[in-house]
Amino acid sequence: MTILTLDIETRPCDDPALIEEIISLVRPPRTITRTESIAAWWKENGEAAKQEAVARTSFDGTYGRICCIGYAFDDSPAEAHCGEEDIVIRKFFFDVTEAAMVKHYDAPVKVHTIVGHNVSAFDLRFLWQRAVILGIPRPQSIPWQAKPWELQDTMVMWNPDREKRISLDRLCKVLGIKSPKGDLDGSKIAQAWADGRHDDIAHYCKADVDATRACWQKLTSSSA
């Protein structure tokens, strides 16, 4: 069985036309109805709301961008590709396909298990969306429509209640695993990218992969 532990880092949309569209959809809260109150809201909060709307696209594959993909096969050392989205995705897909061919010799086969933290709702979906938008062929070795046993999401494994989901940092702490969070975390990726800190992002992404894999191994261990 091949296990692929996956983590992606994303950043907000940088396409001017799309940003204009996103900003055009910003509206005051529905509780504000009076004309003068709406005008006051725009004056006091409008610019911040526009910036927040663009920043939130880093969570949405429709508009956001992938800037780094970290991964590891089975117990192999974690790897990461960081850079322009199209190149990063193609490199990752090539590595996944090559690994499947090397392991199974005759033809690429599906990776049996994808492991990640919030991978079902975020990483895998975001990656699929970006590949579709960019017209990048998706390798058959990744189970895009994964069956339950092909997807091991440590967030869901710990607590399937979405209202009580746990962060990777917190899960690591309660399981006695070194947390990957330090000077850099997901909320700082956009600024790190803007500052050109690609190596730091890649290092952080690989640390996330290592931590996620360690959590998964502990969650699935039969030892007391």
Where do the PLM segments sit?
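Conserved non-catalytic scaffold segment of RNase H-like nuclease domains
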Residues: 1-129
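Metal-dependent phosphoesterase core characteristic of DEDDh/y 3'-5' exonuclease domains
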Residues: 2, 64-83, 104-203, 207-224
